């Protein structure tokens, strides 16, 4: 069972409306919210679930990483796409590529803040999905806190996070950038025009944390990756 026969063990993620299963699949849960002081603490009377199966496709990011890699190494990069377009799959493979290195690139120390368990799918401290040989993972940790923890404990060259959603995430990444760490992250938007209408992105541009933007689109049934300066 996903809960390990213990509702208490999954109470934190369940209160946020999802569960993470072994192997990386994610289960969205709907039901009646149990509120305390305006904060959801649990779900009862479960009415439906939605299973999202994680896919790992090795090698899809290799041409992209080669294109982005420059004389100073890998630049801080933001991945942009609407939900379901493959941001997390691409991000995970980029983490692998950067962590493992290649014949033309050195391996990098990569720190991953896997707040929702979708990147590494940790199970009892072991990644169920490949994230590279030189990767440290903080599982179930809020991004803003996790970035600071990695800076203190893991000596990363690159820090990767999935789905920037809050301003405190930006401030933590600004701290990392000021420490000389490269950043790799995703954000929801269909295109750059939509992104510029988001107040969070305006703040992100002001901080000048990211150098490159990768836009993911689906054209004729195939995913296309386009890069541009940010």
Regions found by a protein language model. Give the residues of each.
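Conserved lysine of the Walker
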Residues: 87
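Conserved P-loop NTPase nucleotide-binding/switch module
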Residues: 154-213, 218
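P-loop NTP-binding catalytic core
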Residues: 7-74
């Amino acid at each position: 069972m996903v809960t390990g026969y213990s509702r208490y063990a999954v109470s934190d993620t369940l209160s946020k409306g999802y569960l993470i299963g072994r192997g990386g699949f994610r289960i969205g849960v709907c039901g009646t919210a149990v509120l305390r002081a305006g904060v959801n603490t649990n779900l009862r009377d479960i009415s439906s679930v939605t299973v999202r199966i994680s896919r790992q496709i090795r090698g899809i990011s290799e041409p992209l990483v080669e294109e982005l890699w420059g004389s100073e190494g890998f630049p801080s990069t933001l991945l942009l796409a609407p939900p379901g377009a493959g941001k997390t799959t691409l991000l995970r493979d980029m983490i692998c590529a950067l962590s493992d290195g290649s014949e033309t690139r050195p391996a990098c120390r990569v720190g991953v803040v896997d707040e929702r368990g979708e990147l590494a799918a940790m199970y009892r401290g072991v990644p169920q999905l490949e994230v590279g040989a030189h990767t440290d993972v903080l599982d179930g940790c809020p991004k803003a806190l996790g970035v600071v923890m990695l800076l203190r404990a893991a000596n990363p060259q690159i820090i990767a996070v999935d789905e920037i959603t809050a301003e405190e995430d930006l401030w933590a990444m600004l701290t990392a950038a000021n420490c000389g760490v490269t950043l790799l992250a995703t954000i929801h938007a269909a295109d750059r025009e939509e992104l510029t209408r988001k107040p969070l992105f305006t703040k992100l541009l002001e901080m000048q944390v990211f150098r490159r933007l990768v836009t993911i689109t689906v054209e004729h049934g195939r995913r296309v990756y386009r890069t541009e300066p940010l």
